[in-house]
Regions:
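Extracellular loop-to-transmembrane helix junctions
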Residues: 8-44, 90-128, 308-316, 352, ...
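Membrane-interface loop-to-helix entry segments
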Residues: 22-29, 33-46, 169-174, 186-247, ...
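Helix-loop-helix module between adjacent transmembrane segments
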Residues: 26, 30-31, 103-127, 133-134, ...
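Flexible loop linkers connecting adjacent transmembrane helices
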Residues: 36-63, 87-97, 109-141, 327-346, ...
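Extracellular/periplasmic helix-exit of transmembrane alpha-helices
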Residues: 112-122, 126, 227-245, 253, ...
């Protein structure tokens, strides 16, 4: 048995049994404890999302809630929303979509808790806020070793594994256009272009990352959702039957009993968790960068990111595939080729070009969002400019190499590290959940008094944070 085989087995066990229990349990628990905050205060989140960025004493714009939302959505909305959903349908059938939706609805509560905690325990350095699970593990739990372990896992997963995967998916999307693509120089040329473009963005710092994300993500999300709506309108007579099939297959007891690990339940839940990342500890790294008056405001904004990712974008992919009538088979016609063929069946060949363009836009936004997460954690381990620049060079190299080869070992390692990362984060937010609930109570109390909520640490019995009067 090779090391890659061991990683695959560990990955299957972790996602099928351990993470499903922890993340689904966490979603249910926090939904109950917050009284469904992801539904009750959703309109507040939309309002805060649109608040304009303020300027600092030097006249420089601060990171707004919207920019922080776009950075986290950039990371969430990658090729997994296209290729990943196709694979889920091919392997788990239409019923997987229902469980994916349910995970997003429940996961919104976990996303709220972790992002609120990231805001509460963020730090300010060189005029910019940073934070995330590593920071609340150190500042609130007093366990720096736990934060360092989390940071190492996240860096391996996002900076190297997932960014290599995004680059490879962009490269593989060109196979439709260039015969014998893998044996040409085009993968290397694409690798150079992607590496150069990513370098330009990341050396511009958080403001450039936020600006690029806030341009690419909203435009592409709207275009992609519109494409989904057009496809559904062209097949409107079939929609009732498709929705009925999704719900029937979701509760197909015979299929579930026949093989739980490969059932629609497990595949849908795994895809939902993998796509929206709620509770996994990645998005809080972006949440902490926002300059807001109350931590709850950014917690609510991050709920929207989960819904954008799964309820809107993943659902658009699912509907485009299901109405096409094109059959997907794992290993034969799955992932990107499945989507390209399904779209062309609906709207003609131009749909293939649209999917290719979407893959490039979503994947590039993911590259810079993933990098931002990793940078925050490098600085947590050691705040060194030399280390940061060396790290940036290695990230660029991973993207360059990822465009040229299928590094399945690296990606399996990334999946395993993300699993461990999620376990560490879920333990932390369970331990710190009451802090987030006190902060939520403070927000709702001020809101009932007709105030625009402002947060100060002593109001909820905290000390040692940036939230001083």
């Amino acid at each position: 048995m090779t090391f890659n085989d061991i990683l695959t087995k560990l990955n299957d066990f972790m996602y099928t049994y351990v993470l499903i229990v922890l993340l689904v349990g966490g979603g249910v628990y926090f939904t109950i404890r917050t009284k469904g905050v992801q539904f009750r205060l959703l309109m507040d989140g939309i309002k805060f999302m649109l608040e304009k960025a303020e300027t600092d004493e030097n006249g420089k714009k601060k990171v707004s809630s919207f920019q922080a939302l776009m950075i986290s959505t950039a990371s969430r909305v990658g090729t997994g929303n296209i290729a990943g959903i196709a694979t889920a349908l091919a392997a788990g059938g239409p019923g997987a979509i229902f469980w994916m939706w349910l995970m997003a609805l429940l996961g919104g509560a976990s996303a709220f808790i972790e992002s609120t905690l990231a805001q509460v325990y963020k730090v300010k350095e060189n005029g910019q806020f940073r934070g995330g699970p590593s920071y609340y593990m150190e500042k609130a739990l007093g366990k720096r070793w736990m934060g360092v372990w989390f940071s190492i896992l996240l860096i391996i997963c996002f900076a190297y594994g997932f960014n290599g995967l995004q680059a490879y998916n962009m490269s593989s999307a060109l196979e439709y256009y260039i015969p014998n693509y893998a044996n040409t120089n085009y993968p290397m040329i694409l690798g150079i272009i992607l590496a150069a473009a990513t370098a330009f963005v990341i050396w511009g710092g958080v403001h450039r990352i936020g600006f690029i994300s806030s341009v690419i993500v909203p435009v592409m999300a709207v275009l992609y959702i519109l494409m989904g709506l057009v496809t559904m309108l062209l097949n409107i007579a079939e929609l009732p039957g498709i929705f009925l099939m999704i719900f029937q297959k979701a509760f197909d007891v015979q299929a579930i009993a026949g093989g739980f690990a490969g059932s629609a339940v497990v595949i849908g839940i795994k895809r939902g968790l993998f796509s929206n990342e709620a509770g996994m500890g990645s998005a809080p790294n972006a949440s902490a960068s926002a300059d807001v008056a109350h931590p709850v405001k950014q917690g609510l904004v991050q709920v929207i990111s989960v819904f954008i990712d799964t309820i809107l974008i993943c659902s658009s992919t699912a509907m485009m595939l299901l109405v096409s009538g094109v059959e997907g088979q794992s290993g034969v016609l799955d992932g990107i080729p499945f989507v390209q063929k399904a779209i062309s069946a609906n709207v003609g060949e131009w749909g293939i070009h649209f999917i290719t363009f979407s893959i490039f836009a979503f994947a590039f936004s993911s590259l810079i969002g993933n990098y931002f997460y990793a940078e925050s954690n490098i600085l947590f381990i050691k705040n060194s400019k030399v280390l940061l620049n060396v790290f940036r060079v290695t990230c660029i190299a991973a993207i360059f190499l990822g465009a040229q080869a299928d590094f399945s070992l690296v990606w399996n390692l990334a999946d395993v590290t993300m699993g461990f990362m999620a376990i560490v984060n879920i333990i932390a937010i369970f331990l710190l959940g009451n802090v987030a609930l006190r902060v939520l109570a403070d927000y709702e109390k001020q809101k009932k008094q007709g105030k625009n909520p402002m947060f100060y640490e002593d109001e909820v019995g905290l000390k040692g944070t940036v939230w001083k009067k």
